[in-house]
């Protein structure tokens, strides 16, 4: 595969991580650049790791991923989105929110990288070498996630709790989109 093809694949896979990073960036107070880096490292690492797992697993997990992955992604994103909305409406109003604990980051990273697992499986079926695509996918996702977190912070700084609610709705909508795409392909 050419560099351009791998780059475009990386962009496509990184869009979910970008949206989730932007949503997360709206809720973190106080926001530090290290928060954006933490998001970027988690999402970039998972987006790079999942194709490798898919490539190794190949057809063994193919049926599970195709049947249950969209539901898992939907449930994880909907749960975290509802949690964000609840915290925006009823949470501590002192302006300090930090939703970047490792368990939340892990769930978000898994939910946004399940499609990369399927890409890895397709690489295995096609006999495509995995190293170059994985590096490019991870780097593109890192940059997109970092930029998404900064953009989310900038928007959240101006609109406060309204953007937290919007961020939660984005996560729920993203989960719904993943599920709807799966249902349309059945």
Swiss-Prot record:
Q: Which HAMAP family match?
A: MntP_pump
Q: How does it sit in the membrane?
A: Multi-pass membrane protein
Indicate what this protein is called per its UniProt record: Putative manganese efflux pump MntP
Q: Where is the signal peptide?
A: none
Q: List UniProt keywords, sorted A-Z.
A: Cell membrane, Ion transport, Manganese, Membrane, Transmembrane, Transmembrane helix, Transport
- What species is given as this protein's source? Methanosarcina acetivorans (strain ATCC 35395 / DSM 2834 / JCM 12185 / C2A)
Entries under InterPro entries matching the protein: Mntp/YtaF, Put_MntP
- Show the Pfam families listed in the entry: Mntp (PF02659)
Q: What role does it play?
A: Probably functions as a manganese efflux pump.
Q: Which residue ranges traverse the bilayer?
A: 1-21, 39-59, 61-81, 102-122, 134-156, 165-185
Where in the cell is the protein located?
Cell membrane
Q: Which GO terms describe its biological process?
A: intracellular manganese ion homeostasis; manganese ion export across plasma membrane
Which gene does this sequence derive from? mntP
Q: Which GO terms describe its cellular component?
A: plasma membrane
Q: Which GO terms describe its molecular function?
A: manganese ion transmembrane transporter activity
């Amino acid at each position: 595969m050419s560099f351009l093809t791998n780059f475009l694949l990386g962009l496509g896979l990184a869009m979910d991580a970008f949206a989730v990073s932007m949503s997360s960036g709206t809720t973190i107070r106080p926001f530090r650049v290290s928060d954006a880096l933490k998001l970027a490292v988690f999402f970039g690492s998972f987006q790079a790791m999942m194709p490798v797992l898919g490539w190794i697993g190949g057809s063994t997990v193919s049926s599970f991923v195709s049947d249950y992955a969209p539901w898992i992604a939907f449930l994880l994103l909907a749960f975290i989105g509802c949690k964000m909305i609840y915290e925006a409406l009823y949470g501590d109003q002192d302006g300090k929110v930090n939703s970047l604990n490792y368990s939340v980051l892990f769930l978000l990273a898994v939910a946004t990288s399940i499609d990369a697992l399927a890409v890895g499986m397709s690489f295995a079926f096609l006999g495509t070498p995995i190293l170059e695509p994985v590096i490019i996918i991870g780097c593109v996702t890192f940059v997109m996630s970092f930029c998404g977190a900064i953009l989310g912070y900038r928007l959240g700084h101006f609109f406060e709790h309204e953007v937290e609610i919007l961020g939660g709705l984005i996560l729920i909508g993203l989960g719904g989109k993943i599920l709807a795409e799966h249902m349309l392909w059945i």
